[in-house]
Amino acid sequence: MTQFHHVRLELAREAGHPAGDPTDGYDIVAPLDADGRLDGDALRTEPERGHVRRFSRGETVGAGRLQQGPGGAWILNLDDGEDADARGFRFSDERFVAGEYVSLTLPSGEQHTYVVARVVEV
């Protein structure tokens, strides 16, 4: 059975952040199946439960919705507009379990990798 979870993503090591940055990332409330994979059917059933919070330097810089778009793409929409603020890179294939890495692509095409810092059922 799919449950909703709070998933914390923190910026992983990259140029300019050789140790990563736990104060830069996303808090996501998302439906995960028993294997830790995103469940699009569960999100379509309860879309109001899919939330995203973007933080930088520990401060909230945006909040919005987790959505599944055309072709199954996972979208982080921080301003409730039509355009994605970030797209999950192959999120449908990823497992959201602590210690795993996932990538997000910004509208500019810039891509960043995040570590799944924690996953807690809500």
Residue spans for each PLM region:
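N-terminal intrinsically disordered, low-complexity, charge/repeat-rich segments that act as generic
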Residues: 1-44, 56
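A short, compositionally biased
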Residues: 3-5, 69-72, 96-100
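Short beta-strand micro-motifs in enzyme catalytic cores
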Residues: 5-7, 74, 112
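Residues in well-ordered beta-strands of folded domains
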Residues: 10, 29, 67, 77, ...
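Intrinsically disordered, low-complexity boundary segments flanking structured domains
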Residues: 12-18, 52-53, 61-63, 102
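Well-ordered beta-strand positions in beta-sheet-rich domains
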Residues: 25-29, 63, 88, 113
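Short beta-strand/loop turn elements enriched in aromatics
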Residues: 47-87
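Short, compact, well-ordered microdomains
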Residues: 77-122
